[in-house]
A protein has these predicted regions:
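A short, surface-exposed loop/turn module that caps and links secondary-structure elements
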Residues: 29-54
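Enriched for short, Lys/Arg-rich terminal
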Residues: 1-6, 10-13, 17, 21-24, ...
Length: 84
């Protein structure tokens, strides 16, 4: 059974602003991570509650993993903007 994915409004807008082929690549990579756990994921330091980032080429998806049953996507940004 897969995880429930919750997108905040800002993350939805950021994904819509990205060109379609890149946005689809991001969605496929996110789906693969949610199904298999595969992907370049790291916990971000000094952030509470714990937040993670999934690296997909030049883009970063920031999210909270809620005890394994749901994931809240908080941002989808180009790497030059992701850590500001």
């Amino acid at each position: 059974m897969g995880k429930n994915v919750i997108w905040n409004d800002q993350a939805k807008a950021q994904l819509r602003a990205i060109d379609q082929p890149t946005a689809l690549r991001i969605l496929h990579a996110l789906a693969r991570y949610l199904e298999t756990g595969e992907g370049d994921v790291k916990r971000l330091q000094n952030i509470e509650p714990p937040e993670f980032r999934l690296r997909i080429g030049d883009y970063r998806v920031r999210f909270h993993d809620h005890h394994g049953d749901s994931v809240r996507i908080t941002a989808v940004k180009h790497r030059r903007e992701a850590y500001r």
